[in-house]
Amino acid sequence: MKNNKGFTLLELMITIAIMGIVVSIALPAYYNYAARSRRVEARQVLQTIAQQIDQNYRVTRNYKQLADKSELSDATLALWGLDKVPTAGNEYYKISFVNNSINESGYILQAQAVGVQAGDKDCLYFFYDQSGVKMASTTATVPNGSRDQVSQTCWAK
């Protein structure tokens, strides 16, 4: 009797089906993990910018004016290299001031999800103001404070 070696078509199809099931479970979990890690990076950049603005405020007593008498703006964020997340490579968040919200007494920074991260429908926008209030939204509208569920969920993860 001849001893055959190899796989039958049925064994191959079962293996492919099992791999398909594993991939269908693993990929969404990975994408969710990657989106959450990019959220963390965006929040860190917002807080870094806020620290720089606050250090400047201690000198000038004016959020809008820098120590060299120039005005703080979205262009300044670009000069600092903090206008996108990450600062090099594929952009996941665009950092800017909300509708030129910066003035002498305050500001609101926003991180808007772009590119691949725009698929993260739960936390499309992060906001941070001069008082350290952390907000998030699924739209470009700044929430009223940080007590809403979206803000609490997005800043916690």
Task: State the predicted function of each range.
Residues 1-34:
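N-terminal single-pass transmembrane signal-anchor helix
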Residues 35-62:
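Membrane-proximal N-terminal amphipathic helix
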Residues 58-157:
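Periplasmic/extracellular, small/polar-rich flexible segments of pilin-like filament-forming proteins
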